[in-house]
Amino acid sequence: MSKKIFISAIEYSANIHALKLIQSLRNLNLNFEIYGIFDEQIINQKSQFSPNDFRVMGFSGIVKLIPKYFDIKNKLAHLAMQCDIAIFIDSSSFNIPIIKKIQNTKIIYYILPQVWAWKGYRAKLLSTLCDELWGIIPFEKDYYPKDSNICYVGHPLLDEIPYSNTKKQNTNKIALMPGSRKSEIKNLFPIFKEVSQKIPDKKFILIAPKNFQNKNLKHIYGEIENIEISFEPYNTLKECEFAFVCSGTATLETTLLGIPTILAYKTRMLDFLIAKSLVKLKFIGLANIFLSYKYHKNINKKKLQAPIHPEFLQFFNAQSLIDAYHNFDYERFFKEKESLINYLEYGSAKICANKLQNFYKNK
């Protein structure tokens, strides 16, 4: 008999993780049907609700979506209760209110909220609401109640990224990754573009999200006629010797690929001030955060020798990034990259699929 699996995947990355999980389930020859809210183009299956209207950035941006969210929250909960398993991936602000309304369905949270960074109360809340918590960071369990049903399932990027053990050769190509949200791009891409203009001996490649392929890129990025465009992040990054990126997750991706990286993040001032008051972290790049914990058992350790990659937040200009590029510590980067891969150990898709298979057998 076919099992019904509900999936809630709002963000682009969450849909990629969901796809890998679904592929691993199919490799086990399990009979199942997928329902929920996810990207039809990525999952290659019809969804009952589209996540496109709910992808926002920042504290103030989400306010505009509240009326629409309340309209479908009950519908999503009702759909989940018609399924055998409900899997919620990332996006805790979106998912937790839905989970609270679900009864008599096994609830799994995959890609847990970063309670180690802010809103620590969510750890106890999710432990109460969910049947299983699937963590993708080795130290996450230390921030949850001891009686929580939480386990480390591996990191999904080790499934998705052809990480490299060899040092990059000089290719004269540099990747620009200013984010996937339009507000990110608006704030950051003009600075990245200026960087590209001031390093004329390198070829710069703008890596755009795949779902931008049919959109007006000039409307999103502005004038980009002198910059090559790519919609294939991993294939493109493998050809690059350096990257400028905007997100903490992207730094983990580039590090696993062996691409020396600089992180730069700029948002609306209101959002920045709110985040600064709530988030108590020394770093925002995941590679830096993970290594901080690996070496010091403390994600806020001030005595970390040096970050594996430089980080620039809010108050910087193109010249700041250029100076960091010219002074980058390549030797330390490649040494710490190996430490990071060893720390994460393995990917998560197969482990999660096996857990679901065991649930099928025991039901």
List where the protein language model places each region.
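Short acidic-hydrophobic, aromatic-tinged amphipathic segments that line or gate anion-handling sites
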Residues: 151, 228-232, 311-314
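Phosphate-coordination loops involved in phosphoryl transfer and adenosine-cofactor binding
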Residues: 2, 171
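Active-site and donor-binding regions of nucleotide-sugar-utilizing enzymes
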Residues: 3-166, 177-189, 198-201, 209-211, ...
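C-terminal alpha-helical cap of glycosyltransferases
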Residues: 346-363
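A donor-sugar binding/catalytic signature common to diverse glycosyltransferases
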Residues: 231-281
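Nucleotide-activated donor-binding/catalytic signature segment of Leloir-type glycosyltransferases, i.e.
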Residues: 217-232
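Leloir-type glycosyltransferase catalytic cores
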Residues: 282-349
